[in-house]
């Protein structure tokens, strides 16, 4: 059975990855479908988001990424998918998603919507939250995969962290020196 996991993924978060991984255990193929939405100005282009998703999900052999325009139901039919996969963080998500599922059902009776409750640790997480934190110079390392964090820091042109190209381990951005104790500054300079 083929499932479509549609969204903007601008950027993909650990919450998205949680749904993708869990969906990959339930379905033969999960297609992470990036909507080209001309009414939004994204942080990353569709092509950049597709590359980010492919890199993030390369360990999942039954997951692929693709871009699409138009109605999700039409795209699902083109890809011969039977299921739309959606993540739910809160009751407010459920109300919106249920309405969307009912609307999609009026467009195609052949496609079902399957909801997965987001894992507790990601129940607050959205791409908008990630961008808002990064916009004001906060760390997003714990919210997105390491390579995505680097891309985000570059976009916002902050003192973004550096990554070891071999391990992709992130060295956090320098703290505001006014909040760092003198011993920490000395230790940082010694290393």
UniProtKB/Swiss-Prot annotation:
Q: Where does substrate bind?
A: 8, 40, 72, 86
Q: What organism is this sequence from?
A: Nostoc sp. (strain PCC 7120 / SAG 25.82 / UTEX 2576)
MF terms (GO), sorted A to Z: ATP binding; pantetheine-phosphate adenylyltransferase activity
Q: Where in the cell is it found?
A: Cytoplasm
Question: Is Calcium there in the keyword field?
Answer: no
Catalytic function, reaction form? (R)-4'-phosphopantetheine + ATP + H(+) = 3'-dephospho-CoA + diphosphate
Task: Check the record and name the InterPro entries matching this protein.
Answer: Cyt_trans-like, PPAT, Rossmann-like_a/b/a_fold
Q: Where is this site: Transition state stabilizer?
A: 16
Q: In which pathway does it act?
A: Cofactor biosynthesis; coenzyme A biosynthesis; CoA from (R)-pantothenate: step 4/5
Record text on subunit structure and interactions: Homohexamer.
NCBIfam families from the entry? Answer: coaD_prev_kdtB, cyt_tran_rel
Q: What is its main location?
A: cytoplasm
Binding residues annotated for ATP, in chain numbering: 8-9, 16, 87-89, 97, 122-128
Keywords annotated in UniProt: ATP-binding, Coenzyme A biosynthesis, Cytoplasm, Magnesium, Nucleotide-binding, Nucleotidyltransferase, Transferase
Tree of life domain: Bacteria
Cofactors named for this entry: Mg(2+)
- Name the Gene3D superfamilies on file: HUPs
Q: Give the Pfam families listed for this entry.
A: CTP_transf_like
| Name listed for the protein in its UniProt record | Phosphopantetheine adenylyltransferase
Cellular component GO terms, alphabetical:
cytoplasm
Q: What EC number is given for this enzyme?
A: 2.7.7.3
Q: What does this protein do?
A: Reversibly transfers an adenylyl group from ATP to 4'-phosphopantetheine, yielding dephospho-CoA (dPCoA) and pyrophosphate.
| UniProt similarity note | Belongs to the bacterial CoaD family.
Tell me a GO biological process for this protein. coenzyme A biosynthetic process
Q: List the disulfide bonds.
A: none
């Amino acid at each position: 059975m083929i499932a479509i996991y549609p969204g903007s993924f601008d950027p993909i978060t650990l919450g998205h990855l949680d749904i993708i991984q869990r969906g990959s255990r339930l379905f033969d193929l999960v297609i992470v479908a990036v909507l080209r939405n001309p009414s939004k100005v994204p942080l990353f282009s569709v092509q950049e988001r597709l590359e980010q998703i492919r890199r993030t999900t390369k360990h999942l052999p039954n997951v692929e990424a693709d871009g699409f325009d138009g109605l999700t139901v039409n795209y699902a039919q083109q890809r011969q998918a039977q299921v739309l996969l959606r993540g739910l963080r809160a009751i407010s998500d459920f109300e919106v998603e249920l309405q969307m599922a009912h609307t999609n059902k009026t467009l195609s009776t052949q496609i079902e919507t399957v909801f997965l409750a987001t894992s507790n640790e990601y129940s607050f997480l959205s791409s908008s939250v990630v961008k808002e934190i990064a916009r004001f110079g906060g760390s997003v390392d714990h919210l997105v995969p390491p390579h995505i964090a680097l891309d985000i820091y570059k976009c916002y042109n902050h003192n973004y962290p550096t990554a070891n190209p071999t391990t992709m381990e992130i060295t956090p951005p320098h703290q505001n020196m006014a909040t760092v104790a003198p011993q920490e500054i000395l230790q940082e300079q010694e290393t």
